[in-house]
Amino acid sequence: MNAGILKAQGLCKSYKDKEVLHNLDLTIEPGKIYGLIGRNGAGKTTLLGILTAQNTKNSGEVTYDGQPVWENQKALNDICFSRELQATLFSGPNNLKVKHYLKSAAIYYSRWDQDYAGRLLEEFKLEKKKKISQLSKGQMSMVTILIALASKAPITILDEPAA
């Protein structure tokens, strides 16, 4: 049975001549906590992006509930990939106010808990009318953690949550 299991088999990824993932096998089960440790440039963020259908792979297979993650609505609803916001980007999401960024995140997660998001916003003392680009690095981390928690996704992946 593959219920709620995110699985990679034979995963390979290269950038030009640099192979960052070689024949990687990985199984992630809901309700468990995993850690991924490696040096800068080792392929951690690349792997997380591939597992969540946000980056392409060269070869191998990634499945959720036994089905490929690409173009899989169940995987999109059930897996939250919350990645580090970049303070240097002043376009895209960083140009949004916190309240609009959270509203857009709610669209992607069918289990989104708006009340919980509001409570976390207050508890983290985040100003909802501030643009993402105006937040400190620590506040940006709080926004990514808030989204991960409020998504209520069975599988939540945090990339550098406290960077």
Segments from the language model and where they lie:
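Catalytic Walker B motif of ABC-type/P-loop ATPase nucleotide-binding domains
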Residues: T156-E160
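The feature captures the beta-strand-to-loop junction immediately N-terminal to the Walker
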Residues: Y34-R39
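Conserved A-loop
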Residues: C12-K18, Y64
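ABC-family P-loop ATPase nucleotide-binding domains
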Residues: K74-N77, R83-V143
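Conserved structural motif at the start of ABC-family nucleotide-binding domains
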Residues: L6, L21-N23
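Conserved ABC transporter NBD signature motif
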Residues: T52-A53, G60-E71
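A short, proline-enriched helix->beta-strand linker immediately N-terminal to the Walker B motif
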Residues: L149-P154
